[in-house]
């Protein structure tokens, strides 16, 4: 509880220092906190009830949504705060944090503005490749060492990354719902 409180305090401090205008628009704050709470609850639920694997959850959707409606810096910081909160309930938080941060950065950098669906396909593909590359590096460091025995690779994880990328494609229709719910306008509509 203390860890989550400190992270949220840091996030609020960032908003107060650099994004005071978000306090004027209630939709901005509502969107940010709704996304943080949503991803944290989903992660805790999946870990507690041992449902699938958390790598199926499209965490990169969070910075994409915030990037489209707000800005890149806020998208990155919100993503970092959410990933750190979600990592509390995991068995291997270090691997999770590095993988998700890399995927989130790729999602932010590959998507300047979302005006066509093809941009989201490209972003989803880049996110999948990032997940796979980071996880492959982890596997080389931990499981295989420097050997080239690829039969020891955990193929299931790569399947989770592909499912994650497919779920990431649902960002586009979700943006319409979020626009109506929180009162935003974007280039998507």
Task: Walk through the language-model features, giving the residues of each.
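Generic detector of multi-pass transmembrane helix bundles and their immediately adjacent loops
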Residues: 16-26, 37-189
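Selective detector of the "anchor" transmembrane alpha-helix that sits immediately C-terminal
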Residues: 2-18
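Loop-to-helix transition at the N-terminal end of transmembrane alpha-helices
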Residues: 28-34
């Amino acid at each position: 509880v203390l860890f989550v409180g400190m992270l949220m305090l840091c996030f609020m401090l960032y908003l107060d220092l650099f994004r005071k205008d978000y306090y004027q628009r209630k939709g901005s704050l509502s969107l940010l906190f709704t996304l943080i709470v949503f991803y944290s609850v989903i992660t805790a639920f999946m870990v507690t009830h041992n449902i699938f694997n958390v790598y199926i959850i499209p965490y990169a959707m969070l910075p994409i949504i915030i990037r489209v409606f707000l800005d890149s810096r806020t998208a990155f910081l919100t993503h970092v705060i959410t990933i750190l909160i979600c990592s509390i309930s995991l068995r291997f938080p270090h691997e999770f944090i590095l993988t998700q941060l890399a995927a989130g950065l790729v999602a932010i950098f590959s998507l300047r503005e979302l005006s066509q669906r093809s941009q989201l396909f490209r972003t989803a593909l880049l996110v999948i490749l990032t997940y796979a590359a980071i996880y492959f590096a982890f596997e080389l460091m931990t499981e295989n060492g420097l050997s080239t025995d690829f039969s020891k690779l955990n193929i299931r994880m790569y399947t989770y990354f592909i499912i994650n990328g497919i779920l990431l494609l649902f960002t586009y229709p979700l943006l319409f719902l979020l626009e109506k719910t929180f009162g935003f306008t974007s280039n998507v509509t």
